Amino acid sequence: SKLSGRTPVLKETTHWFLDLARYQDFLKKWVLEEHADDWKNNVLGQCRSWLEAGDGLQARSMTRDLDWGVPVPLPGADGKVLYVWLDAPIGYISATKQWALDNGKDWKDYWCNEERKLVHFIGKDNIVFHAIIFPILLKDHGGFILPDNVPAYEFLNLEGDKFSTSRNWAVWLHEYLERYPDKIDELKYTLTCIAPETKDAEFTWKEYQARVNNELADILGNFINRALVLTQKYYEGKVPACGELTAEDQQVLADMKAIPQRIAELVYQYKLRDAQAEAMLLARIGNKYLADNEPWKLVKTDPKRVETIMNIALQITANLGLVLDPFLPETAAKIRAFVGTEAKPWDEAGSILLQAGDETNAPTILFQKIDDEFVAKEVEYLHASQPAAATNFPPQKEETSFDDFTKMDIRLGTILDAIRVPKADKLLQLTVNTGIDTRTIVSGIAEHYAPEEVIGKTVAVLMNLAPRKIRGVESQGMILMAENEEGKLSFMIPEKGFEAGGEIR
């Protein structure tokens, strides 16, 4: 055991099983046929590996011998608890019932109403529990709706390593918001851009910097600021009238109208990364429209044409305040405040939201550029936070006196020979030159070193440990080893080429 260091003992026990094979035909039809076109490939692939590999589904134990968990309420089940993935999904229903009770709602309207859609947003390591085991429970009980979709995500890594809360290798949201309360949407945007919808992805602060600077600031922020500043400058903040439309104007307005529908389709396909990109496309279109038409130059020669250009730019601005709402709600609210509009139903997105003469307000900067110092600070903070994480190392032992310490005779020794101790997987019998004699030491390092690996190694030896027999071999001392959090052992080898017999003090 990595936790206790003790050797596991094989024992007989009794468990209760869920006979998954009984539901093989139901699941193959429901998952692989009925959802072949609308479920993600990674979900279908995992389900297929369970349903079609070998003899198909096999019975799976639904009980455990543990001292924590939900007790099994059956005769003869003393000491048994429910397998967590039998119990945990049922907790979804219990949580809904409690929420409904607290808020005067009917929980059955969510779990038993065929008009509702049950969607499991999960990580890829929990696909089978939400696409196979939980649906079996719902189906067998009866009266519950089955999941409409299980859009499982792949893994998100962080700065070249896996996220680990135990090692504190994480970006903690509450800490981020304490440091940057005005940068909520910047983090949301970056995370959605790199969402691991189809493959593993990685969050880095350099990526965050690039997304904020190159996309949010240079495209979205630049367009919004330019459209509103020019409106303040030319029309005292009032929306100008729209005149005759060119082919380019008509295409831009057609794109503005089509984008919300595409966003909705992508959202309902659970392609949130593409949906956000589609919303940002409207900002790109607006940015390009102003850059191509250069109203700041054209105003000197054709002010009427500029009125139409600015009207269209403001319509795009107002629509960005609507289509960005699902992704960047803080930013969308600011944009609506700039143009003086309220939050509107989605079916109004893509339409003309502003009338000639409507008042707009002077803008503020939506996104501040992220500099290299910000990135370096966050990476340093991430690394610096690791020592504060919980470790598996034991606490410091009680203090001992210097006199007691000096009683230990610790010296360098060289391993001359090594063989495995019969019928002992962990033990090596070592022949060690200690500088003053050659002695036999039995050491529990066989799971970490092969006999041929240790010959010639200079190691630390506790010399005056009382001899004792281990598996019939008298051991005359102890090899001192270093151990890491994972329980792996390593020799403590001197930095310089010291000879056997040198004292360690």
Locations of regions flagged by a protein language model:
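Structured secondary-structure scaffolds
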Residues: 2-233, 277-279
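Gly/Thr-rich phosphate-binding loop signature of adenosyl cofactor/nucleotide-binding cores
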Residues: 250
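Phosphate-backbone binding interfaces of nucleic-acid-interacting proteins
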Residues: 387-505
